[in-house]
Structure formats: structure tokens, C-alpha cells
């Protein structure tokens, strides 16, 4: 099984369930109904899309997320892709805020 390289450099085993959950959340956020088998098919397409990006059994989490965006959009789920992109942007903002707070706290200490 592949290893996913997280943003902090740590590695975890690839969990397709996490990809599936993220896609379901994007569908729910966009208010679009979905079928379980469609979600499973999208997950399979995502794995096929990022397969060429795997190097030495490892792939960066951002590469997987890019593949999710691409597959959702190419599958005609543009609104779902937008929801997914917005979720990623919001998570990035939160990470940046946390990093800034930690940096500030270290400065003060």
C-alpha cells in the first residue's frame, strides 16, 4: 500500500476511506444528492489519476487532493469540485493562522 506524505513531512498509510469521506462531504456541502456507487467510482478514478504521481511508493497529500478536484470537475460535478476547493482553501487559512499564532507565541516566550 502507498504511503501518504502529509504537510508536516510525516508518512501515513493511504486510506481510501478518507478520500471517500472528503468527497461525500463536498457533495453534502454543495447540496447535491449522490449514490454510494457513484462515490466509489469517483474514488477509483481519483486513484487512477494520481497513480502516475506516486514515487517510491509515496505520494503527497496535495497530489491526492489535486486529483480529487480534477476528477470531480471532469466528471461533471463542477459545484462539488468548487465546494471541495473552498474546503481546501479554508483548511489552508486555518493552518496558516495556527502557524502564525505558534510563531507569535514562540516570539513572546
Predicted feature descriptions by range:
Residues 1-109:
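Extended catalytic cores of very large enzyme megasubunits
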Amino acid at each position: 500500500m502507498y504511503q501518504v506524505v502529509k504537510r508536516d513531512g510525516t508518512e501515513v498509510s493511504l486510506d481510501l476511506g478518507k478520500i471517500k469521506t472528503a468527497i461525500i462531504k463536498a457533495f453534502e456541502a454543495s447540496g447535491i444528492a449522490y449514490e454510494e456507487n457513484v462515490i466509489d467510482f469517483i474514488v477509483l478514478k481519483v486513484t487512477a489519476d494520481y497513480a502516475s504521481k506516486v514515487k517510491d511508493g509515496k505520494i503527497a497529500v496535495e497530489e491526492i487532493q489535486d486529483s480529487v478536484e480534477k476528477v470531480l470537475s471532469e466528471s461533471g460535478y463542477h459545484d462539488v469540485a468548487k465546494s471541495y476547493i473552498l474546503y481546501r482553501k479554508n483548511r489552508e487559512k486555518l493552518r496558516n493562522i495556527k502557524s502564525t499564532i505558534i510563531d507569535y507565541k514562540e516570539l513572546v516566550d
